[in-house]
């Protein structure tokens, strides 16, 4: 029972990681295609985008999703997301154009070339959409890297803990065998034990602090849930008394 309970969170994390990888690849594929259309020079916008490794992976993921979900469903989802992204990008573009106009007037009143200085704020909806896609992809990749680094650090912590124990045992055996004087041997063993205890405290404090923080958050959620249930039960009792 304990093994199945402990393996369930790892399965959820793995599923979330796989889904996030798929989403990141799709977003980056869309961002690459969009940025090539929007930010390329005028003479190169009509050329076909160069097919790199990331674009090939994005197309493969898109074909896989078409196979799993279905081309029609995937097309409907893609069109819906495109319309939503276009509406958001258009609103942001209008806001940036208004902001650039106000800033240009203020800079012109100060004797500066306001139109030239605020040219970078005049973004089209397609350019805003490109920034949003790259930003979403960067956030997903950041989450994946954080998860991966957490797993790597956890594994390295276990390995370093075992290595620390092996080094301590080797030092203990070497001291007992090589130091003939009992007083010197006792002092060296005391120093070795003190060093081992300090290293154990320093390496274990971070993990214990993170575990304690997670437990505190879990208890806070449970307390909030109990309060909500008590309020709901009190409201139900009041309604019954009024009836």
Swiss-Prot record:
Subcellular localization(s) per the UniProt record: Nucleus outer membrane; Endoplasmic reticulum membrane; Sarcoplasmic reticulum membrane
Modification note: The N-terminus is blocked.
Keyword terms: Endoplasmic reticulum, Ion channel, Ion transport, Membrane, Nucleus, Sarcoplasmic reticulum, Signal, Transmembrane, Transmembrane helix, Transport, Voltage-gated channel
Membrane topology: Multi-pass membrane protein
Gene Ontology biological-process annotations: cellular response to gamma radiation; intrinsic apoptotic signaling pathway in response to DNA damage by p53 class mediator
Tissues showing expression: Widely expressed. Expressed in skeletal, cardiac and smooth muscle cells, in brain, including neuroglial cells, cerebral cortex neurons and cerebellum, but not Purkinje cells. Also detected in Paneth and Goblet cells of the small intestine (but not in the epithelium), duodenal gland, pancreas, parotid gland, testis, thyroid gland and adrenal gland, as well as in epidermis, choroid plexus, ductus epididymidis, lymphocytes, fibroblasts, endothelial cells and seminiferous epithelial cells (at protein level).
The keyword Endoplasmic reticulum is assigned to this record: yes
Protein name: Voltage-gated monoatomic cation channel TMEM109
